[in-house]
Every structure is written in structure tokens, then in C-alpha cells.
Amino acid sequence: MQEHIQSISFDGREIRLKTGLFAPQAGGSVLIESGDTAVLVSATTAPGRQGIDFLPLLVDYEERLYAAGRIPGGYLRREGRPPERATLISRLIDRPMRPLFPQWLRDDIQIVATTLSLDEEVPPDVLAVTGASVATLLAGLPFYGPMAAVRVGLVGDDFILNPTYREMMNGDLDLVVAGTPDGVIMVEAGANQLPEADMIEAIDFAYEAIQELIEAQRALMKELGVEMVSAEPPAKDEELEKFIGDRTTDKIKKVLSQFDLDKNGRDAALDEIKATEIIEAIEALPEDAPLRLKTTEEPKLIDNTFKALTKKLMRSQIVEDGVRVDGRKLDQVRPISCRTAVLPRAVHGSGLFNRGLTQVLSIATLGTPGDAQEMDDLHPSDEKRYLHHYNFPPYSVGETRPMRSPGRREIGHGALAERALLPVLPPKDEFPYVIRVVSEVLSSNGSTSMGSVCGSTLALMDAGVPIAKPVSGAAMGLIKEGKEVRILTDIQGIEDFLGDMDFKVAGTADGITALQMDMKITGLAVEVVAEAIKQALPARLHILEKMTDVIAEPKELSPAAPRLLTIKIDPDLIGMVIGPGGKTIKGITEQTRAKVDIADDGTVTIASSESENAEKAKRLIVNMTRKLNEGDVYFGKVTRIIQIGAFVEIMPGKEGMIHISQLAEGRVGKVEDEVAVGDEVVVKVREIDNKGRINLTRLGIHPDEAAAARVAAQ
């Protein structure tokens, strides 16, 4: 393919699509640029694998630090494991792309987006999402696109399309919307308690802008002569469908209408139907029967056909009868219970949140500024002081499997709950602690990420973190059959698995703090998205009421948490406080058993579980950094002796010299006649010369001054 460049004027900013220049062996590739940000996106396919029942799509977002003119740290000086933010962008690309491939497709598909250049004004993530659609179209894959994504910010009362990093950090909204000609397909947002009406308006604003990028992709494909591919699905196995349907339809309906069954009971009943009514019946067929031969060769045919029938019957029950598998109404929340302080007080704060069979235990830990996470990626922020980690062990769903490091799902769910709480956390200057919350999913039946939001709120309040408002969350679902649409409140596992939407909404009583919407269909009208947001509000408020019944206000700071004291020193004195090789600051730590962190601006944070130790460290640092004045009296220790005098450490890291003539009244023959190394002496600052050298004396000190100096030193 020859090089081709298409420019799009998009809200006053140019977006360039360059094809035919890079990655000639990829199925399709595009370099998408805006400003000085450039992202190379490729889409490649390989022949399918036998015996799988899922779409083998792999999406990778890669960051290269050369894009920002930086060399990686570490011994190897090269990029290692993708940072968390890169994993989140991989998910951001995957989520709108996955539902646009035919679900019967079994070819391996890999989409790789690599940031080659970074402009601090233009984030690369939404460019990568749009680029994934372009690359896939160029690769000639079956794809229900085009698809595009935009970001919307809110500064003051104005929505901003594709805001800069600075506008994002200073605004009240960070919203990413992906859409197709059929509607909205993905939403990701963090907001500062934004009212529902404003969020809906922002999504509508985004979807209108998306249409320009969709039309640009269509125009590009037309210019390049690329035809849209719409492959036909494989023929259905009507014989197997009829065989299974005739034997199990009524029995499945009966199970789905047994509202007293919990998740495990329902799963067991459905497994029993499959085993006795299908598998045994097929095994009873003659060995050469076509149906038996077919299912023997492809055992997953039975599972897939049975699941498809169960899905159809469950959806029909919801659409036609307005009843869910557990008997709830469409807008009804499962039973909720909450507890705080469920762990011993060695833990700073804990909260247990139960919603139906979903149970999340969240634990809050308060640390010092030195515990902040340093970020080594392309994002301009250099550290995080609030961390949320989400764990999903196999026992939470009654399974056994090896325990691994967190996967993309765990990282994504943790980031969503983190984003939901950020707007209500106290500012650093009011609450200098670094905060880590870990959410342990102990039992899962849907909406564990929103359970983590609720559990985190309980744990933070239990730890004594003065959050502005409590935050709750609910997961909304959707069943769409033709023109019939049903929105479900607080979906459980089977409704998530067999439904068309998973829409997580978190916020306070005043507004939304986080959104995440994923679809299994090719798009949803903005009006339906708006209805889901509105329906989530009473559910969130109901959950908030249950939470505040247990803990209405943050408690006093946990007695197990370190006590922090903060002081400011002259940045020029930081080196003196640290000392050569860290000697001075280590001495303070050993002497007081307090942890000391010093920021580049001279902010010193002192942490200790004992207030007295923190105060002692504070006095030491204040004394050693205060400006010395002639006439000040100190109680110090002789550190070394020379022929003409003795050096005395009057505070950690600061020494002065007593000339031999100032050691005592009258003539002194030898310094050693008056003092020895290790002696503790009272001295007065006699002079500070123009080089900053401190001259001391033992003469002319009043007994009251000496006594005060001894007390101050202690």
C-alpha cells in the first residue's frame, strides 16, 4: 500500500491518519497523530484454533519512554513489565473493540498500539482506541465498525473536547466515550461529584463528536478502496438445538422461576438438567448416530447450545414477565449488610460489605509520604498517594486454580474503585498520609468492583480518614430484544454473563464520581444510556443509607496509624539534615524511632506510632535548622580536638569550634587539660564568620542560661 495521509480538523485540532508507511507485514496499520503525539496501531490475524469457544482477541498498549525523550531506569535501562496505566489503556482499547467482532469468530487477532512520540498537550489513549478501529478495517477483518473514541473534560461550565493533561487535572470531569454508528459502546469516567444531568449531557456531547471521526474513517476506506467485510456466521446446528430444546426448555424455565434458589443452587440444578436430559440421552443414541458422533468430536457443542438456550429463556422471562431469576423487580437491589472494624486494631481500618452473595472485605492502611508510589510512565504525574488494590481469589467463586499476580481484570477493577474515591479524599496539605486500600473479594456473584467501592468507603471512615462524603456504587445491566429494552438494577453474575451491558455507576449523594460501561452489542442510544444513569441513582442512595446506618461520620484517626507532624525548612538546609551518606537523618531515626521524609520543597514529615517520639524528632530538626544567632547557648558534645581548640556538635550535623583561649578563664596550656572527646559542655555562640563558620566560647555564660540549654537538649 502506498503512503497516504488524511487530515481531519477536529474541534480546532488536527488529527492525521497515516497509512502505508509503517509495519508493511501487519494485516493493517495506521500512525495516528495529533500535535506531537503519535501512536502506531496494528491489527494482525492468524488462522483459528480448534476446540475453543471464545474470541481469541489480544490487545496490547505499549509505552516507550523515548516518546518523551527519557531513558528508562534500572540496571537494564529498557522498558520492562508494562506499568499499570499501560494495562488500563490496553483495556480501554479492548472493551469497545471486542463486541464489534462477530462472536463466532475463532481466528487469533492481535491489536498492538505503541506510543512513538508524546506531546504533553495530547494524551495518546483515545487516539489509540480510534487507531484500533482504523487498523482493523485496513486488515480486512469481519468488524462491525467503524468505531471512534473522544475524551470530554469540564472546566467551569464548559465541556472541552479532547482536553490537555493540564485541563484534565484542573477540571471536574475526565470522560472517555467510544461509539459506533449504532450508538455508544463504551464509557469510562471520573468526576468530581457531577450531577446525573450533566454527565448525560457530556456523553451526548461526546457521541456527536464521535460521528466526525466515524465519517473520516469511512472516507479513508473509500479513498483506499478498502471494502467493509461482513462475513456470514456459520450455520446453526438446528438438529442439536431441537434435541436440547425439546428435552430441557420447560425444565430450565422451572429452574429460572424458582426464586428461592441461590446462585449455587441454580447452577447445580441447571447442571443436573444438562447431565440427565442431554448427555445421558446422547449417550443412549447408537454409536454411529450423527448427533452422537458430532458431539463426541466437539464436546463444547452441548455446553454452548445449552447456554444459548438458558440465555434466551432468562432474557425472555425478564422482557415478557418483568421478573428476574431471584424474583427481584427490575429496579430492586439485593439485600445489603455492612460492618466496620471487623479486624483487630493492628489494622488501621476495615469494612465488610455484603450484597446478596457478593462479599468484599476492604482494609485501609495509612502511610507516610515516603510510601507514595512513584510513577515511571509517560503520564505527567510523578506519584500516587492513594492506592486501591483489588484481589479476586478463586475461592470467591468456589473454584480452584493457581494463585497468580494480578491480571488485567484485577488491575482494572482496582483502578475503577480508586477513581470513585479520589474526589472525596482530603487534600495533601490537610491530610498528608499516603492511603492504601486493599479489597479482598471473599465471595462473588456480580458487581464486586462496586462492592469494593462501598467496602473502601467503610474502611476509610473506620481508619479515620476525613473523606468529604461517603461513596457507594451499583452495577446496572441491560436486556435488549429487538426494540424491547429492559434496564436492570444491581445485576448478579448470571445477568452480567447473559445480558448485554455492564454499567457501573459510583458516587455520593451529590453526584457521580466514576462510571464504567461495557457493551456486548454494537451500540446503545444515548437516551438508553441516560435512562440507566438515572435508574442507578435511587439504588446508590439506598446503598448509601445502609452504609451510613453503620457509620455516619469518619471515626477518630486509628490509634494504630502513625502520627504525622509536618514542618517546613529552608530547602538549602536539606543536605545538612540528611547528612553525608544519610548519617544525620539515620541518627535522628535511631534516636527517636521516628520515620522522617523530606520533600524537595523543604516539607519534612515525621511519622511515629508514639506522639512523643515524633515531637522529639521535630525538636531535633527544628533546632538543627534554625538560624543561629550570636549569644545563643547550647549543650553539646566534644567531637574532636586539635591543637588550637575543640570542635563541639551543638546539634545534629552542626559543629562549632571553641578556640583554646575560650575554653576557660586564664591561660590554658593544652586543650586536653580542659576537655576530652565525648565530654558534654555548655557553649555560647560567640561569632559566625562570613564563611558560616561557628565560633564558640565557654566564657560569660549565666547559670540560668546553662540550665536552660541542658533542658532543651534533653
Swiss-Prot record:
Signal peptide: none annotated. SMART domains: KH, S1. GO terms for molecular function: 3'-5'-RNA exonuclease activity; magnesium ion binding; polyribonucleotide nucleotidyltransferase activity; RNA binding. Keywords: Cytoplasm, Magnesium, Metal-binding, Nucleotidyltransferase, RNA-binding, Transferase. It catalyses: RNA(n+1) + phosphate = RNA(n) + a ribonucleoside 5'-diphosphate. Its cofactor is Mg(2+). Involved in mRNA degradation. Catalyzes the phosphorolysis of single-stranded polyribonucleotides processively in the 3'- to 5'-direction. This is Polyribonucleotide nucleotidyltransferase. It comes from Picosynechococcus sp. (strain ATCC 27264 / PCC 7002 / PR-6).
